[in-house]
Amino acid sequence: MAREFSLEKTRNIGIMAHVDAGKTTTTERILYYTGKIHKIGETHEGASQMDWMEQEQERGITITSAATTAQWNNHRVNIIDTPGHVDFTIEVQRSLRVLDGAVTVLDSQSGVEPQTETVWRQATEYGVPRIVFANKMDKIGADFLYSVSTLHDRLQANAHPIQLPIGSEDDFRGIIDLIKMKAEIYTNDLGTDILEEDIPAEYLEQAQEYREKLVEAVAETDEDLMMKYLEGEEITNEELKAAIRKATINVEFFPVLCGSAFKNKGVQLMLDAVIDYLPSPLDIPAIKGINPDTEEEETRPASDEEPFAALAFKIMTDPFVGRLTFFRVYSGVLNSGSYVLNTSKGKRERIGRILQMHANSRNEIETVYAGDIAAAVGLKDTTTGDSLTDEKAKIILESINVPEPVIQLMVEPKSKADQDKMGVALQKLAEEDPTFRVETNVETGETVISGMGELHLDVLVDRMRREFKVEANVGAPQVSYRETFRAPTQARGFFKRQSGGKGQFGDVWIEFTPNEEGKGFEFENAIVGGVVPREFIPAVEKGLVESMANGVLAGYPIVDVKAKLYDGSYHDVDSSETAFKVAASLALKEAAKTAQPAILEPMMLVTITVPEENLGDVMGHVTARRGRVDGMEAHGNSQIVRAYVPLAEMFGYATVLRSASQGRGTFMMVFDHYEDVPKSVQEEIIKKNKGEA
């Protein structure tokens, strides 16, 4: 079957926002106007098309990023609806990795909120062009220009309106298009009847002022336009649109639009902006990767003629078809029934069926082309972040960064019958979600699950009960501490056992140095002259990795350390991989005596919003919890406090804040970084762990 839409007419976009900004409702309206659904589903009624998991419909939040494909103005738009809750950031990250552009949805009463900052930062990291949709213009307190100012103040974004609202709150009735300099007035509730009129007289002056600001801001990104602007020449609408498109695709400019998805206003104009300003797969740089055979960098331009290359970005278990692997095709063509190579794992995989998804319903297709997003049935070994390529043209694409879990809890099956089912359920859930880890405590035999927050683990335990019918008892949440070395040191690990029969002999000298935060463990082989034979080097690294899983102070994993193997010796007969593994672990234990080991704890960026009169209470809360205030700002009658607080001190804070503010205060927290715990706290943690051992 030939390609239905050319690459120029394809858009791969994500819809991202802070929780409750109206993101899923916006996606619903897109599906309604593009003819995908005939009845609009409201999120607050639990009937939304994109929120298809049971818990999503109950909680009214989006958990998994449902992918769907729609058509608008002779273009294909592939949309991924991503969650706005901080506990599900991996869903946002993996979506951004495979998208070409994004729509950031704001609540126009609040503007930029904490999770908006997180997803914005992630989108900037991946170089994703964005347009901004200031939603909920019908809401009490909606303020479009305030929302735009928060984009400048909190995100330092070069964002400018390309529209202005006509009225706000209950009086929100239309939109001024600053490019055409026309007003779009809505005359019915479904938003399908739109009148294009001249701008109402009372809005004309404001529209001219903002059109001028827009032209000036765009001209700064385009030399030719700047010359025309400075010489006072007329800039045509086409020139302005072309310059906005170029600057948006280069991530130098962010157009801001307004509307109310709930009241069906502004969504079609936002879809027009997706087509006008966000890139097609041809507008973005060709994807880069490493050829595993030559270790050279190669590129794959977006073209059907190039060899097939795709990235798997999500695994999902479907009750009817089994394991689904969502993937983005960067180049080439793939037919169902063909074989591909998973270059990340070095395994050959057969593509069973190829499905194009609409939330959770599916259409089977024969072929996918460059620029498409689809799901495959039948892949056994592929996980999130793996590259799938033509067997004759191997390439490993950049994978997806997976944040480390910060919270853990113990789960135990309620009955013997639940025991086996729980193992299978947890394994399937961990396959779908790389930020969810399952481990067994070696000493106690307990199963420990870790994730990105209480809600994250809550949802997963809930899914275990509903989807896999496993009943489990759940322990109290615990903090995922880490350990590290703060001083460089050198240590010897010497292991010798000779008591009849074949002996064991391993001898290594290793230099340990602190690594940058977040860089993890790095191993370097600096052996010269074969004093440790080449075949034993991997055993040394393995021995270190295994012993770093249980740190020296309190048994927490050791992170952010470099190890350089620089000397050692071996025995012709008695040396073995096992002996060198043991020697490496002895070197680590020895190094710990002089490397100033420290315990690290997760620090959360906490944003607390309270009435003015409770500001003093909140400052007290932060100090009492070993936190430090990073900044404050007033918004209406509320105060917004940003602070860094250890996760360990935040358990139960919701109750404290509720009683201090008579239920009017709210807070959001997102993991920010790991930091050394104070000495007194470190001693307590060590004592507690020794007491339990």
Swiss-Prot record:
<dbReference type="InterPro" id="IPR047872">
    <property type="entry name" value="EFG_IV"/>
</dbReference>
<dbReference type="GO" id="GO:0005737">
    <property type="term" value="C:cytoplasm"/>
</dbReference>
<dbReference type="InterPro" id="IPR005225">
    <property type="entry name" value="Small_GTP-bd"/>
</dbReference>
<feature type="binding site">
    <location>
        <begin position="81"/>
        <end position="85"/>
    </location>
    <ligand>
        <name>GTP</name>
    </ligand>
</feature>
<dbReference type="InterPro" id="IPR014721">
    <property type="entry name" value="Ribsml_uS5_D2-typ_fold_subgr"/>
</dbReference>
<dbReference type="GO" id="GO:0003924">
    <property type="term" value="F:GTPase activity"/>
</dbReference>
<keyword id="KW-0251">Elongation factor</keyword>
<dbReference type="InterPro" id="IPR009022">
    <property type="entry name" value="EFG_III"/>
</dbReference>
<dbReference type="InterPro" id="IPR000640">
    <property type="entry name" value="EFG_V-like"/>
</dbReference>
<dbReference type="InterPro" id="IPR004161">
    <property type="entry name" value="EFTu-like_2"/>
</dbReference>
<keyword id="KW-0342">GTP-binding</keyword>
<feature type="domain" description="tr-type G">
    <location>
        <begin position="8"/>
        <end position="282"/>
    </location>
</feature>
<comment type="similarity">
    <text>Belongs to the TRAFAC class translation factor GTPase superfamily. Classic translation factor GTPase family. EF-G/EF-2 subfamily.</text>
</comment>
<dbReference type="Pfam" id="PF00679">
    <property type="entry name" value="EFG_C"/>
</dbReference>
<dbReference type="InterPro" id="IPR009000">
    <property type="entry name" value="Transl_B-barrel_sf"/>
</dbReference>
<feature type="binding site">
    <location>
        <begin position="17"/>
        <end position="24"/>
    </location>
    <ligand>
        <name>GTP</name>
    </ligand>
</feature>
<dbReference type="InterPro" id="IPR035649">
    <property type="entry name" value="EFG_V"/>
</dbReference>
<dbReference type="InterPro" id="IPR041095">
    <property type="entry name" value="EFG_II"/>
</dbReference>
<dbReference type="Pfam" id="PF00009">
    <property type="entry name" value="GTP_EFTU"/>
</dbReference>
<dbReference type="InterPro" id="IPR020568">
    <property type="entry name" value="Ribosomal_Su5_D2-typ_SF"/>
</dbReference>
<dbReference type="GO" id="GO:0032790">
    <property type="term" value="P:ribosome disassembly"/>
</dbReference>
<keyword id="KW-0963">Cytoplasm</keyword>
<dbReference type="GO" id="GO:0005525">
    <property type="term" value="F:GTP binding"/>
</dbReference>
<comment type="function">
    <text>Catalyzes the GTP-dependent ribosomal translocation step during translation elongation. During this step, the ribosome changes from the pre-translocational (PRE) to the post-translocational (POST) state as the newly formed A-site-bound peptidyl-tRNA and P-site-bound deacylated tRNA move to the P and E sites, respectively. Catalyzes the coordinated movement of the two tRNA molecules, the mRNA and conformational changes in the ribosome.</text>
</comment>
<dbReference type="InterPro" id="IPR004540">
    <property type="entry name" value="Transl_elong_EFG/EF2"/>
</dbReference>
<dbReference type="GO" id="GO:0003746">
    <property type="term" value="F:translation elongation factor activity"/>
</dbReference>
<dbReference type="InterPro" id="IPR000795">
    <property type="entry name" value="T_Tr_GTP-bd_dom"/>
</dbReference>
<dbReference type="InterPro" id="IPR027417">
    <property type="entry name" value="P-loop_NTPase"/>
</dbReference>
<dbReference type="InterPro" id="IPR031157">
    <property type="entry name" value="G_TR_CS"/>
</dbReference>
<dbReference type="Pfam" id="PF14492">
    <property type="entry name" value="EFG_III"/>
</dbReference>
<dbReference type="Pfam" id="PF03764">
    <property type="entry name" value="EFG_IV"/>
</dbReference>
<protein>
    <recommendedName>
        <fullName>Elongation factor G</fullName>
    </recommendedName>
</protein>
<feature type="binding site">
    <location>
        <begin position="135"/>
        <end position="138"/>
    </location>
    <ligand>
        <name>GTP</name>
    </ligand>
</feature>
<dbReference type="Pfam" id="PF03144">
    <property type="entry name" value="GTP_EFTU_D2"/>
</dbReference>
<dbReference type="InterPro" id="IPR035647">
    <property type="entry name" value="EFG_III/V"/>
</dbReference>
<dbReference type="InterPro" id="IPR005517">
    <property type="entry name" value="Transl_elong_EFG/EF2_IV"/>
</dbReference>
<keyword id="KW-0547">Nucleotide-binding</keyword>
<keyword id="KW-0648">Protein biosynthesis</keyword>
